[in-house]
Amino acid sequence: NKISDRVSRNDWKDNNQRGGYIWHTTGSGKTMTSFKSAQLIANSKDADKVVFLMDRKELGSQSLTEYQGFADNVDDVQGTDDTNMLISKLKSTDPKNTLIVSSIQKMSRIKEDEIGRMRAKDIEDMQNKRLVFIIDECHRSTFGDMLITIKNTFPNALFFGFTGTPVFSENEKSLSTTTDIFGDELHRYSIADGIRDKNVLGFDPIMVCVYPDMELRKKVAIEEADASSEAEAISDPKMQKIYYRFMTVSEVPMAGRLLEDGTYQKGIEDYIKKDAWENDKYQYSIVDNIKENWLRLSRNNKFHAIFATSSIPEAISYYRKFREKYPELKVTGLFDPTIDNASGDRALEKEDGIVEMLNDYNNWYSTNWDIARYAKFKLEVSERLAHKGQFVRMKAESQLDLLIVVNQMLTGFDSKWVNTLYLDKILEYQNLIQAFSRTNRLFNINEKPFGSIKYYRMPHTMKNNIENAMKLYSGDRPQGLFADHLPDNIEHMNISFKDMEAVFKQANIADMQKLPDDTESKAKFAKLFREF
């Protein structure tokens, strides 16, 4: 194990906190692997304390019991109910307190919570121990400030990160890269490896163009030419030049692109105003598209889906449209329930939306959730969607069909019962891979051959984003990541060809040498040829 080797060779006085990071794709058993690494170090006696840190939400939903199940002995894994208990176990010399599981939030508050009551000697005692921290899901940007605080509190500690989606120079933006924070990559098991080894499923991304490409192109061309109509744009020589430039795909592509000199060339979708993606007509089109394909994609309601939107107001708007048009679908939403009274009408709208969702949910499932207990409501929804806890053997009528979110549940949530992700949201790099990976947990291959993704907003831009993310996170080996429709396509072509042959045979024409004379046969051939 490269982590335990690194710990055994560590000079605890050189203040080098960067132990390295492990890149193991989402769904490959990363959390168990990271936990086992912590256990190996604890057993090796090369460190006084091994602290396994994760997000409090993950710790809350997956529970300490699960981690104790990984261990040989339940007492080998110590939980921490509060900051005081965490401090007590960090100071302890009892061998059973060597391996500690806690949240990164709790660990970051050690100094801030206790500085007034804690003797400097206590902090010094903890700092003098050989501490190893293993951070699960270390790519999360929310961990940034907390990790800095922990590193400052324990300057001699050694830090390791586990992630399915490291941050590289290509996608760092305001984030530091994973290497900057944790050091060198120690081991890699990319999404390409996971799919090829059949540990996770591949993806079937489907682009849905709510607006026809030519409609958008024409709209942008007329606006950029500063014309009031297409006729005016063509008739005026100055306007005409601009109009035809925007109407030419090689001049202005549908999606923007980065040129070799590092400059960004805008695409048609970059010129489209935001309200094109936020109006009722557009939203109803998506709601209808989801419902039209619901039985096919959900395999007759066996599987569930997540629908990620771009904002909370949009999530509420979509929820209401589903309830209005398709009340037979059981739909709910999850997002940050905080009500900011300074936001006025928007805060009221948000509160009304949450109350509506809770009331409908309560009516369906005979529960009594309210905003005050929203965190527990979220836990129940996640268990219902994952068929866990009390919902392991639930009946069909107790299932949830569709969960609408903004950012929640797009990372860290695992359910083999989710097979489809709908996106009215722009995602890139690690956020895209994390969201896609909600759909690719293994199930019976005949019923769930891949994770389905349908994306609507700025579809050509998203298509580029998908290609870029898959290239980066497959280690530049994106082949085999997507559903292979070739066998189905060949079978479909063979059937269409036989049907075309029958049209000519019926008209007594050998080898399709010429078209049949009668209009009906010509029309039938034309239809089959289009399908072919």
What does each of the following model-derived ranges do?
Residues 172-302, 319-324, 328:
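Interdomain helical connector at the RecA1-RecA2 junction of SF1/SF2 helicase-like NTPases
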Residues 99-135, 140-149, 405-407:
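Conserved RecA-like ASCE ATPase "motif II neighborhood" in helicase/translocase motors
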Residues 31-33, 46-69, 309-315:
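Conserved Walker A/P-loop ATP-binding site and its immediately adjacent core
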Residues 69-115:
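Inter-Walker segment of RecA-like/P-loop motor cores
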Residues 98, 251-405:
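Conserved C-terminal RecA-like helicase domain
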Residues 42, 57-83, 321-328:
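Conserved helix-turn-beta segment of the N-terminal RecA-like "Helicase ATP-binding" lobe
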Residues 13-37:
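Walker A/P-loop
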Residues 443-532:
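Long, hydrophobic alpha-helical segments
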